[in-house]
């Protein structure tokens, strides 16, 4: 018992005198980051707001530049006169001009009769237009002359179409009328104020639009009520009658159609009565 107590006291005394080595712990690499995260958590919000603000500015700039490029590539649908002149100068293109210039629009007037069965009506209308020089244009005569004169531009084409019984290409009648008007303007009579009266034309809306694009505006479309009602379908067929009626409707929409009431006895070929309500 005494020996056990002595050993215990010696052990305690030894522990007191023992030197305990000090171990230096290496700092963990995660400790500073963790500490920093905790220490700056409250300060993270302002950088996030700045980042979103900068992203908004950047995105807005990209959208603006992209939109500007698309707008530049988009073809313009309208020009001022100055812009058009600059465009013509830079591109080398010239705008399509009508045969009759704006300055000559008052000097030369154009009247069309989509369908007429008897030439007496054309004579009466020409008399009403007699305050100026009057030139009557018959597309059928122009086609015949062009076909028979092989020196003319469309002669062989018209010959082939006639042999094969094919319809005329779109715009050909208007081209022949344009050539005839151009020739007339270079004559002495063409220097005077002139009313042009074109019979049996236009008979499609395509020809009507081409005339106004290439030659001049139409002053009036004269609609012969009797012939349209009684002779048109009988002589031109249902489909052609429909096309000609569409022409009348086209001019009515632009307020350029003038209906002339003409009456005569159906059993008598001679014109007995005509009343003109004109312009």
UniProtKB/Swiss-Prot annotation:
GO CC entries: mitochondrial membrane
Similarity comment: family membership: Belongs to the AIM36 family.
Gene3D superfamilies (alphabetical): P-loop containing nucleotide triphosphate hydrolases
UniProt protein name: Altered inheritance of mitochondria protein 36, mitochondrial
Localization, UniProt: Mitochondrion membrane
Keywords, comma-separated and alphabetical: Membrane, Mitochondrion, Transit peptide, Transmembrane, Transmembrane helix
Domain of life: Eukaryota
Membrane topology listed for this record: Single-pass membrane protein
Transit peptide extent on chain: 1-35
Transmembrane segment boundaries: 51-70
InterPro entries (UniProt xref): P-loop_NTPase
């Amino acid at each position: 018992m005494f020996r056990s107590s002595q050993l215990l006291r010696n052990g305690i005394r030894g522990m007191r005198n023992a030197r305990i080595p000090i171990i230096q712990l290496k700092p963990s690499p995660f400790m500073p980051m963790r500490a920093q995260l905790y220490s700056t958590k409250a300060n993270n919000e302002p950088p996030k707001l700045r980042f979103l603000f900068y992203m908004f500015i950047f995105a807005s700039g990209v959208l603006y530049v992209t939109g500007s490029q698309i707008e530049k590539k988009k073809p313009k649908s309208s020009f001022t006169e100055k812009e058009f002149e600059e465009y013509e100068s830079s591109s080398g293109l010239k705008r399509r001009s009508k045969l009759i210039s704006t300055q000559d629009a008052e000097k030369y007037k154009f009247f069309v009769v989509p369908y007429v069965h008897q030439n007496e009506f054309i004579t009466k209308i020409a008399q009403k237009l007699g305050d100026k020089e009057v030139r009557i244009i018959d597309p059928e005569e122009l086609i015949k002359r062009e076909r028979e004169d092989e020196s003319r531009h469309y002669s062989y084409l018209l010959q082939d179409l006639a042999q094969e019984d094919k319809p005329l290409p779109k715009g050909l009648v208007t081209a022949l009328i344009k050539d005839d008007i151009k020739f007339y303007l270079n004559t002495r009579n063409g220097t005077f104020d002139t009313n042009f009266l074109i019979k049996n034309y236009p008979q499609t809306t395509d020809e009507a639009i081409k005339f106004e694009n290439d030659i001049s505006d139409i002053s009036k479309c004269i609609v012969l009520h009797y012939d349209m009602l009684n002779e048109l379908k009988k002589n031109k067929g249902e489909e052609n009658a429909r096309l000609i009626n569409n022409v009348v409707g086209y001019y009515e929409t632009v307020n350029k159609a003038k209906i002339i009431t003409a009456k005569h006895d159906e059993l008598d070929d001679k014109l007995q009565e005509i009343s003109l309500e004109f312009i």
